[in-house]
């Protein structure tokens, strides 16, 4: 398959890239600071540019995979309206735009795989923006799946990565971590499988 991978230079994106490429897929990487295409999906015009340039390089895409989406982590009292808006733009609207524009750009039975996270169902202190964004992404996936068939859309919702415990483990006390390889396998399930409207929780 020809796959557009957003957020390819981060820890998760690199793991997803390695796994999908190892299975014989042709990957076009997108990142803000690296990759085949250097673009920011929080800007709808740059999403359009990503699709245009990907089509020039590879023709019709079979799948779009997102491993990107930043949200701020602060207590509610320390958050500003712009903090919440930035988190929503960065993780929700950017990924929605990938699907909204992408339905006319990918194969008729192609797929989208978005990124969400554990905080939508198991919130942590300072994580209200992430919980908001993740919940919105998951609700969008379930609803959009009804509209875009036979194209498919799913999300992957991991907990904290084993490889990131040193940096983030204190924010997730008692939460079982998940290896990046397991998360990448959930992306494979979405890309190569037949389900739609699902949120895969790697374990």
Please tell me what each predicted stretch does:
Residues 5-19:
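N-terminal Rossmann NAD(P)H-binding glycine-rich loop of SDR-like oxidoreductase domains
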Residues 31-47:
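Rossmann-fold cofactor-recognition segment
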Residues 42-60:
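Conserved Rossmann-fold cofactor-binding substructure of NAD(P)-dependent oxidoreductases
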Residues 46-49, 93-101:
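Conserved mid-core alpha-helix of short-chain dehydrogenase/reductase
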Residues 65-73:
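Conserved NAD(P)H cofactor-binding loop of Rossmann-fold oxidoreductase domains
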Residues 75-76, 83-85:
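Substrate-binding pocket helix/loop in short-chain dehydrogenase/reductase
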Residues 86-90, 94-97, 109-137, 141-149, ...:
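Catalytic loop of short-chain dehydrogenase/reductase
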Residues 150-151, 155-203:
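C-terminal helical subdomain
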């Amino acid at each position: 398959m020809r796959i557009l991978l957003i957020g390819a230079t981060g820890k998760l994106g690199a793991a997803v890239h390695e796994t999908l490429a190892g299975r014989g897929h042709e990957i076009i990487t997108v990142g803000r600071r690296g990759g085949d295409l250097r673009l920011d999906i929080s800007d709808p015009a740059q999403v359009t540019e990503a699709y245009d340039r990907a089509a020039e390089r590879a023709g019709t895409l079979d799948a779009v995979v997102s491993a990107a989406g930043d949200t701020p982590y602060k207590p509610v009292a320390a958050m500003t309206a712009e903090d919440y808006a930035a988190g929503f733009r960065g993780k929700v609207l950017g990924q929605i735009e990938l699907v909204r524009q992408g339905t006319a750009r990918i194969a008729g039975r192609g797929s989208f795989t978005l990124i969400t996270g554990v905080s939508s169902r198991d919130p942590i202190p300072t994580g209200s923006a992430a919980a908001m964004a993740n919940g919105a992404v998951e609700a969008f996936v379930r609803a959009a799946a009804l509209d875009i068939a036979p194209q498919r859309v799913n999300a992957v919702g991991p907990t904290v990565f084993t490889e990131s415990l040193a940096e983030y483990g204190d924010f997730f006390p008692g939460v079982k971590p998940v290896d990046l390889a397991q998360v990448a396998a959930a992306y494979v399930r979405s890309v190569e499988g037949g389900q739609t409207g699902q949120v895969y929780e790697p374990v």
